[in-house]
Amino acid sequence: MEPIEQQLTELRTTLRHHEYLYHVMDAPEIPDAEYDRLMRELRELEAQRPDLITPDSPTQRVGAAPLTAFNQIRHEVPMLSLDNVFDEESFLAFNKRVQDRLKSTENVIWCCELKLDGLAVSILYENGVLVSAATRGDGTTGEDITSNVRTIRAIPLKLHGDNIPARLEVRGEVFLPQAGFEKINEDARRTGGKVFANPRNAAAGSLRQLDPRITAKRPLTFFCYGVGILEGGELPDTHLGRLLQFKAWGLPVSDRVTLCDSPQAVLDFYRNVEKDRPTLGFDIDGVVIKVNSLALQEQLGFVARAPRWAVAFKFPAQEQMTFVRDVEFQVGRTGAITPVARLEPVQVAGVLVSNATLHNADEIERLGLRIGDKVVIRRAGDVIPQVVNVVLSERPEETRPIVFPTHCPVCGSDVERVEGEAVTRCTGGLICGAQRKESLKHFVSRRAMDVDGMGDKIIDQLVEREYVHTPADLFRLTAGKLTGLDRMGPKSAQNVVNALEKAKATTFARFLYALGIREVGEATAAGLAAYFGTLEALQTATIDELQKVPDVGIVVATHVFNFFAEESNRDVIGQLLAEGVHWPAPVVINVQEIDSPFAGKTVVLTGSLSQMSRDDAKARLAALGAKVAGSVSKKTDLVIAGEAAGSKLAKAQELGITVIDEAEMIRLLGA
């Protein structure tokens, strides 16, 4: 066997292995970027020796064989995948190939849309009624997922409107919004269930459940982007026209679809989407560029596994492979001990990553991680980089186990793990320098007491020099004492003292949030402040009384009750008040006297708003007598859903709670 034959055989075997893990097991071992690199290498070798191309080469087909647990559906029209480009030069070369094949000097009109990172599906409607749905599978045969697809609320069971074809097969992507993904993993960590590496895996795992009742509980959604079978009817002769027709029939279509009349316009679209990517609320890994004219598409035709008239222009990879060099343990403000992987530095999504969170001991056990392992690292948007999985097939011989500490790495106190919790905590409290530092950083943060100019490095020095032990000590600092800190001149020191003085005037809600009570975020703090009105009333509340507050269940109520029951906490609060911390007396809102549809209602906001900030919306709702909560429960009266609403919207629909959109909220605010 020639060396190139051996190389081709090994590459094909490796790619088939990873295709099986990705398409069939929903458990990819390597990042997409590494798969793409291997595929490019195979294509280049086959281009050198086309006589060695085999019919079963990964370059000649679409995906992997379907699971036998599902019935199989044969695609009457094959579901092909797209070829990829990864930079401007490659896209421009693709554009030139299309122009040359069309023998045209005029610019092609391109239809550009998002490349969703989910699971491709085919849905068949007969006389407007959904009759079957299937995964892509190997492009020829997929898995019958009809029962599961019927549980996805975004997918209509019956199309509406005029001129619906007798048989219409639409194609699109089932995906999971990021908020829903985070909620699923949060629940899984709490209950010991399966934690998914990323939203794509979670969507695939949710859609390919043998029990549709499980799928129904997952907040999956869907965007339509193409057509397979078309019988007994007509569709527009442009791709954009078809998308608009699908939307008119009730099928969801992404609103980020644009016609581009030049290669430069396509590049501008690509850059704009890349810039907006962190705020979309769902994962994409590029943009899809298609010739808009169906006549030109037909003229261009197909290669073995992809159309010549479309390409996926992919973003820089959000996942890369590297090695874990060590694991260190950090202590947070509530004593939570978090393992952090120290990595061989690697570029991920344009950022050099050298650390990644490992969450807790359970996550380390789930990953099967050892120091020295080769791992896949993921960084999406502003999310802290995390280890997605271990590349077990490439584990070095010299790895060693990760040993979780039995004593706090900072203060030496015992650590404990409460039954039912995933987090291990230091028991040292404020004698622990790390907890003290993090508690004080939280106290002065922008959304808490908002002490301008008091950054993390100042807090670190204040604690290390024993100048500050509790939040009250901050208000006793003088410019003279601050001047002794590193890089702190007299003027800067006086500015910090002035900022501390200004911060004394706050709100009850901010003060509660600044105290750092476990599980009490901004929304819960605002709810407690609004419900009880005064510190005295809150301090003396029972656990049962605390649970009457929207968003407060038994766990949060217990944390709040225990916090105020602790004498040292009450002492610190007394000192803060003695130093002059104050807030306005509560304004009692009589909801009976407010003529507003929001008066007396418990309201939850979810998704992103385009007409006003979330804080403005909360303030206006509260002024009209609404109680704005942070999570959906049986106590919730109304959910306001913005763009890319996730798990909160799904839960509201599950509980039968009224849901309105942003436009309706604005209309009612002005009513």
Swiss-Prot record:
Regions that span the bilayer: none
PROSITE patterns: BRCT (PS50172), DNA_LIGASE_N1 (PS01055), DNA_LIGASE_N2 (PS01056)
Keyword list, A-Z: DNA damage, DNA repair, DNA replication, Ligase, Magnesium, Manganese, Metal-binding, NAD, Zinc
Domain annotation BRCT: ranges: 593-671
GO biological process: one example: DNA replication
InterPro entries: BRCT_dom, BRCT_dom_sf, DisA/LigA_HHH, DNA_ligase, DNA_ligase_AS, DNA_ligase_CS, DNAligase_adenylation, DNAligase_N
Annotated catalysed reactions: NAD(+) + (deoxyribonucleotide)n-3'-hydroxyl + 5'-phospho-(deoxyribonucleotide)m = (deoxyribonucleotide)n+m + AMP + beta-nicotinamide D-nucleotide
A single GO molecular function term of this UniProt record: DNA ligase (NAD+) activity
Keyword DNA repair: yes
Residues at which NAD(+) binds: 32-36, 81-82, 113, 136, 173, 290, 314
Enzyme class: ligase
Gene3D superfamilies named among the record's database cross-references: 5' to 3' exonuclease, C-terminal subdomain, 6.20.10.30, BRCT domain, DNA ligase/mRNA capping enzyme, Helix hairpin bin, Nucleic acid-binding proteins
EC number of the protein: 6.5.1.2
GO cellular component: cytosol
PANTHER family reported for this sequence: CHROMOSOME TRANSMISSION FIDELITY FACTOR 18, DNA LIGASE
Similarity-based family: Belongs to the NAD-dependent DNA ligase family. LigA subfamily.
Task of the protein: DNA ligase that catalyzes the formation of phosphodiester linkages between 5'-phosphoryl and 3'-hydroxyl groups in double-stranded DNA using NAD as a coenzyme and as the energy source for the reaction. It is essential for DNA replication and repair of damaged DNA.
Protein name: DNA ligase
Biological source species: Salmonella heidelberg (strain SL476)
